[in-house]
């Protein structure tokens, strides 16, 4: 009985380890190769370590029509994303149903990713997106995000409640 219980516990720990190994990429639409996922995860790791923000990439075919923004925001809110007390982070969604990309930010990331910078981030991967090179598009998006983080917050920026 003890051997069976030990084997079961080891199996559960292995399952949990595998589930947590790729926490920055949820490729529900099946757009990325294994190599692309590895590179995307490495860039996310680098950003997370340097800036203490959570980075997450999500792809989906199942976003309801006209709900891309709400889907991204809700996914961030209800899936435990974000670091620290302010749940700082960024989610990048590729919505294949509505044919849209969206960035959702929380915490300190709001201060770094202004509307203008968000457009620059989306533009960085646009050509690859049009060519259906989704993995390369995300890599460019993340590298542009990292560039803006290195530049720091823009002067004169402020937040207001919507």
Please tell me what each predicted stretch does.
Residues 20-162:
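Folded, non-transmembrane soluble domains that reside on the lumenal/extracytoplasmic side of membranes
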Residues 7-17:
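Bacterial N-terminal signal peptides
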Residues 1-2:
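N-terminal secretory signal peptides that target proteins for export/translocation
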Residues 5-6, 21:
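Residue-level detector of intrinsically disordered/flexible regions characterized by low predicted structural confidence
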